[in-house]
Amino acid sequence: MRQWTAIHLAKLARKASRAVGKRGTDLPGQIARKVDTDVLRKLAEQVDDIVFISGTNGKTTTSNLIGHTLKANNIQIIHNNEGANMAAGITSAFIMQSTPKTKIAVIEIDEGSIPRVLKEVTPSMMVFTNFFRDQMDRFGEIDIMVNNIAETISNKGIKLLLNADDPFVSRLKIASDTIVYYGMKAHAHEFEQSTMNESRYCPNCGRLLQYDYIHYNQIGHYHCQCGFKREQAKYEISSFDVAPFLYLNINDEKYDMKIAGDFNAYNALAAYTVLRELGLNEQTIKNGFETYTSDNGRMQYFKKERKEAMINLAKNPAGMNASLSVGEQLEGEKVYVISLNDNAADGRDTSWIYDADFEKLSKQQIEAIIVTGTRAEELQLRLKLAEVEVPIIVERDIYKATAKTMDYKGFTVAIPNYTSLAPMLEQLNRSFEGGQS
């Protein structure tokens, strides 16, 4: 009776929330969990395969690629594709999408929510994308966060799908007896080298890791005297192109995709790894990968007549560097709109922008840079310190700042952080209404 009440109140809350113009992604779960504290556990027990997707960057793209591919092949799933990746949002997804025929759940999960959610749900497999410095006032340093995750997932019989090229992710191999690695061959692609480096010390002995090849940051082929090393990948990218959309060679199969950004190659590979481990073949995966387009502010493309735009979320140095690199790959003039908020969901500490490589903007052909958000002035200062010699315009209103990019002929590169994403994306949708996206 308690479960029935929780589910029905949650569904009513969803309808009410949407009726007043809100998304209703977290509220139903919050209400249900108050009525029945075991509601998520009970619903999860009805599903055969539960896949958790986590990591600092790329969770949403990886999750959506998996979800889209399964749906494209007529496989019914539970999927929190609206981005609510904490306990309440995950509960909402199970409540709204559970049916007797649904036997697979694809769940993006916030790194900080793993200990809480795993008290209620044990996934059959977890895939980790990467670990970079993100919101340190929320999660603490990377070493602490990774150790906490390893402790939480140990001895639960979870199959771990790990990025072999990231030593932080590879450390999680101590938490399971069943490990599948994915990675990228040396020289598969020449990533731009960043001035930002994460710790490259061995998690076993503390010595400096030796790198045979570096893709970017700490991502690459590494080894240590103590025996810790980059493991052989079962699923591997041998080469890929991006101009700006991805053309991947994974295990000798070609994938012509509609997502941009070289960093997304790892996200596509993570999704591929999950899908293969779920039993899908290459052709089935190709059906999904080659029809996937982003509509959630992750490398989302817009075009109306001669005006073009691209938006990509950036909430840490690695994400910002990736977004700035996309601008470098675009020919001709650009106009940037960059937003920095410091709301609770963003993390109050915005000092991470000083670790991002804004200096690379000086090499691009830029008409103007519009900075916006609650910390617009701090962005302005950071760009001045980077000696970016282009007009820098401060407009704290995100809607107005985004709309202003339409006054310029160049390609709009829009880079919001977490709570900036919704208003910036909304304005781009308005500005490009009737065009291509």
From Swiss-Prot:
SUPFAM superfamilies: MurD-like peptide ligases, catalytic domain (SSF53623)
Subunit details: Forms a heterodimer with GatD.
Annotated knockout phenotype: The gatD-murT double mutant displays susceptibility to diverse carbapenem and cephalosporin beta-lactam antibiotics and shows increased susceptibility to plectasin.
EC number: 6.3.5.13
Lineage, broadest ranks: Bacteria, Bacillati, Bacillota, Bacilli, Bacillales
pH-dependent activity: Optimum pH is 7.5-7.8 for isoglutaminyl synthase activity.
General function of this protein: The lipid II isoglutaminyl synthase complex catalyzes the formation of alpha-D-isoglutamine in the cell wall lipid II stem peptide. The MurT subunit catalyzes the ATP-dependent amidation of D-glutamate residue of lipid II, converting it to an isoglutamine residue.
Species annotation: Staphylococcus aureus (strain N315)
Name by which UniProt lists this protein: Lipid II isoglutaminyl synthase (glutamine-hydrolyzing) subunit MurT
